[in-house]
Amino acid sequence: MPDPNRVLAGKKATLHNPNVSQQAKERAEDYIESHSSGQETGDYSAQAGGRDLDYEDLGDYDEDADFDNEEGLNVLGDESGFVDDPMKTGDLVEEDQLEGKNIENVRGGYKATMHNPNVSKQAKTRAQRALEEIDDETQA
C-alpha cells in the first residue's frame, strides 16, 4: 500500500511541474485538499476500512490531460508517445559531442541501436549514418 505522505508529495510536485497540464494540476490540488488533513503528521485516519483511497480519483481519468499543447502532441513526445530524436537536426555526430567520451562506447551504443528490435527503421538508419560519420572522423 502506498505511503500517503509520498502520494501527497507527488501531488505537490505535480503542482510545480511545468510539463503537467492545467487539468492535472487542478486534480492534484483537489486531491491535496481532500486528503491532506491529518495525514501530514502521520495520522492515517482518512483510510476508511483499510481501503486504499489513493486511487479513487482515477475513475474520471481523462486521456486528453496528458496532452498539453494546441497540436495535441504529448508533452513527452509525439502523437505515438515517442520522444523526438535529439540528433534529428544538423550533423549526426559533431566532434565536440565526442570529446571526453570513449569512442568505442559511443560506437557500441549505435551498434546496439541497430540490433535492437524495439527501435524504428528510421532510428536504425540514423545510427548507421552516425557510425559511418564516426568512422570517417576517426580515420581522418
Swiss-Prot record:
Q: Where is this region: Disordered?
A: 1-88, 110-140
Q: Which residue ranges have biased composition labelled Polar residues?
A: 34-44
The source's domain of life comes to: Eukaryota
Compositional bias, Basic and acidic residues, is annotated for 24-33
Where composition is biased (Acidic residues), the residues are 54-71
Cysteine-cysteine disulfides: none
The record's annotation in InterPro entries points to: Conidiation-specific_6, UPF0654_domain
Offer a single GO CC term for the protein.
nucleus
Write out the similarity annotation.
Answer: Belongs to the UPF0654 (con-6) family.
Protein name (Swiss-Prot/TrEMBL): UPF0654 protein C22G7.11c
Task: Name the source organism.
Answer: Schizosaccharomyces pombe (strain 972 / ATCC 24843) (Fission yeast)
